Amino acid sequence: CANDRVAIGALRAAARHGLAPGASGKGGLRIAGHDDYPLAPFTTPALTTVAQNVEAIGNAAVSRLIEILHSDGKLGGGPQVQLFEGTLRLRESA
């Protein structure tokens, strides 16, 4: 799912329909989120998610902003793409 809050909604919808997400669940439904929401370990089943390194993302954003401010509008190349490693938090939902 796009984020953990959407994945939590998917867990609730699955439960309403009698589905049991997870490796041991019926029907082969596995649900995972993205952003390691603090409540993810406490859902039923516990939500699998990908944790983001928010400190690295924040540092990169501030560095880029400072670079832009010091460039007097002379930065070329347009937007930059920077990838960050995530950490899989494998739990019961997947």
Give the role of each language-model region.
Residues 1-94:
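Flexible loop/turn connectors
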